[in-house]
């Protein structure tokens, strides 16, 4: 059995790794800028230098680019060979708008791992279905939330972030890929080439 290893690459003894921050779903209000600055500083302290999509913040109508625009911004991050992780800081209802505009062959070849949650479940599962490449169901904004100290400690230690305690109600083991996430959003993929 091959164990999936995500490319976190966190170390205080090497130069910072490059990561992307994007929003494939609902954008944040402009008032979120200070929180983004705190997140970027936290990532910097964790050895990660970030570059941002131009579609993080909403306009006067609550939107930020079309599905095509947001997909193009995501693909630019996947194209950058220096980017190791792409953190989507959005969530809501609009992530499925990007699916038909993504180049899955280029995503497969990219060294970057996609991270997101909520309706980013659609992007995570589309990437897996179309490329076989794993993503991470995690909201990077947890690093600056109410449990920031705990989340940052887990983030620094890959074992704590990806290996956790559990009990089997029946049997003693299982194997295979884990898919899913937000079930409402996962079901949006039913009957599509992304399911």
Specify the residue positions occupied by each region the protein language model found:
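Mature catalytic domains of secreted/periplasmic carbohydrate-active enzymes
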Residues: 9, 24, 102, 124-125, ...
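Short, acidic/small-residue loops that bind anionic groups at enzyme active sites
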Residues: 104-126, 134-141
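N-terminal glycine-rich "phosphate-gripper" loop used for MgATP/nucleotide binding
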Residues: 85-96, 117
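ATP/NTP phosphate-donor binding region
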Residues: 2-82
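Short glycine-enriched loops at secondary-structure junctions
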Residues: 91-93, 120-121, 183-184
């Amino acid at each position: 059995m091959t164990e999936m290893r995500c490319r976190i690459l966190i170390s205080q003894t090497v130069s910072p790794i490059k990561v992307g921050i994007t929003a494939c779903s609902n954008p944040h209000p402009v008032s979120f800028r200070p929180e983004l600055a705190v997140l970027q500083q936290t990532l910097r302290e964790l050895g990660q230098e970030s570059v941002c999509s131009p579609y993080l913040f909403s306009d006067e109508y609550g939107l930020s680019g079309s599905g095509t625009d947001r997909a193009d911004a995501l693909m630019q991050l996947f194209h950058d060979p220096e980017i190791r992780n792409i953190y989507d800081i959005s969530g809501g209802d609009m992530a499925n708008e990007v699916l038909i505009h993504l180049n899955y062959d280029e995503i497969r070849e990219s060294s970057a791992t996609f991270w997101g949650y909520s309706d980013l479940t659609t992007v995570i599962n589309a990437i897996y279905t179309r490329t076989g490449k794993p993503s991470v169901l995690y909201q990077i904004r947890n690093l600056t939330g109410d449990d920031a100290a705990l989340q940052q400690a887990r983030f620094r230690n890959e074992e704590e972030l990806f290996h956790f305690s559990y009990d089997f109600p029946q049997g003693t083991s299982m194997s295979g890929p884990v898919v899913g996430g937000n079930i409402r959003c996962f079901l949006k993929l039913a009957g599509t080439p992304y399911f």
